[in-house]
C-alpha cells in the first residue's frame, strides 16, 4: 500500500469541499 493516496485523497476531497462551499456562499450573497 502506497502512502501517496492516503495523503492525496484528503487534500482532493478538502479542496473540492472548499470550492463547493465558496460557490454556495457566493450564490447566497447574490
UniProtKB/Swiss-Prot annotation:
Keywords carried by this UniProt record: Signal
Signal peptide: 1-18
Top-level taxon of the source organism: Viruses
Protein family: Belongs to the interleukin-1 receptor family.
Protein name per UniProt: Truncated interleukin-1-binding protein
Amino acid at each position: 500500500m502506497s502512502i501517496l493516496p492516503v495523503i492525496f485523497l484528503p487534500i482532493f476531497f478538502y479542496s473540492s469541499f472548499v470550492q463547493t462551499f465558496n460557490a454556495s456562499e457566493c450564490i447566497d450573497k447574490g
